[in-house]
Amino acid sequence: VSMMVGSDRIQVPEVSSGNIVALTGVRSAAAGVTITLDEDSTPFEAIRHYSEPVVTVAVEPKSMKDLPKFIDALRTLGKADASLQVSTNQETGEALLAGMGELHLEITVYRLEEEQGIKVTVSEPIVVYRESISSDNNGRSFEGKSPNRHNRFYIETEPLPDDVTNALREGVFGDGPVRLKDAKGVGDRFAELGMDKDLMRKIYAINGTNVMVNDTKGIQNLHETRELIIEGFNDVCKKGPVADEPLMGVMVRLVDAKLHEDAIHRGPAQTIPAVRNAIKGALLRSKSVIFEPIQKIRIDAPNDVIGGVTREVTTRRGVIEDMPVDGNTASVIGTMPVAESFGFSNDIRAATQGRAVWNTENAGYVHLPPSLFGSVTAEIRERKGLKQEIPGEAHYTD
């Protein structure tokens, strides 16, 4: 145990509250955890990050001899930076870094190379989009059949109101399966935001900004497949039917089911794909939309080069919301799609002879313009090794 005094670390027997403490020997600790010797103590409230990673790059060491060190370094970075997501591409084995933007990932790569001494190869940045829907199924449920044809699930989907989606994003309702004994209380909290109380009291699970509810009546043996149904729901939340991108702001309703009486015929290999297909088919039956991440941006520059600033912003599908002037300096304030922000730092320096100062902040997601829907989804699907054409409902009927 040590106290931090400037950049110096002074070892002490104990540290009183209000000081900055340095601990060694707690390798498994990550940012935001509570360390205590009392097993019954209440942990500090978790640090909640409202911004989601919107840009991903694949990284790998240039020298395979650095691989063990590279893996350890990624674990360390993931613990120290809670806004950085570290994962592995199961098909290629590449390490994937997902962060708040291009600059965030550039800093992470810099730390890998300069602080850890590992030279890495980095892919082009990839934007993380979100799939959603803009309408319900008009009462037309979609039937999903199990591979053995003995089980059928009927699903309807509808978009969640924006205030409910935002509350889910902020973690108001928690995440994961909802225990039966907690469903009533969770449903009542949804009702406070205008949702149907009776329906939401039958909630099965929450996954990110999506919810699943059981809107069936008297289905025999349904409770035995509850966990498998939730697993199918979670699969679709990770990869939607349009472009295998995460789902956002959708309510999935199980409205009916026909189950084989013998449990051996409704196991995981039968139930999960049936539910997954039913949800994907229902989503396609609704009007599919893509959401893209955007950034708030502010650029300060001398008046004589502000024309170059506005030109750079507008050519990148940016929206200028305000242009205040203070003496010889003007500011451009607005929003810009993350997908259009790559290379912006170099271009804005060139447009202003290096005289601009700017900052960005994640601003959530907005609808991708309909004119770009086809080209963007085709590009995503091609990158992921999928057919460029989005499958129709019929793809999920068998």
Predicted regions located by residue number:
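Accessory interaction regions appended to the cores of large information-processing enzymes
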Residues: 1-398
